Swiss-Prot record:
UniProt-recorded name of the protein: Leucine zipper protein 2
Amino acid composition bias (Polar residues), ranges on this chain: 262-283
Compositionally biased spans, kind Basic and acidic residues: 286-298
Name of the gene: LUZP2
Main localization category: secreted
Organism: Pongo abelii (Sumatran orangutan)
Amino acid sequence: MKFSPAHYLLPLLPALVLSTRQDYEELEKQLKEVFKERSTILRQLTKTSRELDGIKVSLQSLKNDEHSAKIDVQKLLELGQKQREEMKSLQEALQNQLKETSEKAEKHQATINFLKTEVERKSKMIRDLQNENKSLKNKLLSGNKLCGIHAEESKKIQAQLKELRYGKKDLLFKAQQLTDLEQKLAVAKNELEKAALDRESQMKAMKETVQLCLTSVFRDQPPPALSLITSNPTQMLLPPRNSASKLPDAAAKSKPQQSASGNNESSQVESTKEGSPSTTACDSQDEGRTCSIKHKESPPSNATAETKPIPQKLQMPPCSECEVKKAPEKPLTSFEGMAAREEKIL
């Protein structure tokens, strides 16, 4: 019997089957793995295709972007050129400005130096002015003190001027009184002259009456009385002569007494007026009283003159009161001029 190779292979079949089964299982596993890998690859491919699509889109966008970028680059280049040109112009302008600023800075530096010198000079001037102000303040203080002293002096001077004004008024009033007195004295002088003429006629009449009385007495007396009279004829005859001689002496004495009394009265009036200026500033009523007093004082002098007959003519002495009263008129005018000047100064 002939054995074929297949008979030889039959016992090996189970092993082959097992091996094949194992191989199939392994293959199935491998196939599964391959399918898995294929699915993963497909998935990856889809992803990659998608990514490729995105890349294509991005490439197109990039192309578009590149084109726009090129346009932008060109624009930027143009702008860069323009900016370069502008920068050049700006640089030139800046250089010019720098030159100008440098020149200005030099000028400012010069002005600053000049101002510094002026500030130093002015500071010195300010110091000098401060020192002058201090000296002026001291002078002002001294001047204020002097002003106070001058103010006090001016007050005193004003008080003196007021007193002088009142004194001027008193002096004017005294001058008026003196003029009135001069007029009154002139009137009294005229009256005295008239009275002297009347007294001469009265004295003549008195002499005649005395002689008549004596003759009548001597005629009416008895003879024994005549013996007595004849024993002392000088005593009987002397009285008329003595009386006649005494009468001129008494009249002469009465005249200087009257003039002296008038001078004393005028001096007393003036002294009272000068000693008490308040009393001299009287009213017109006081003037009337003084006039009435003087008129009352004058008649007794006339009466005494009439009681004492004067055979000779009465020679009136020069009016000393008039001379005394006329003399103060000149100082009055000078005093009025001084008062007017003081009023102008005020």
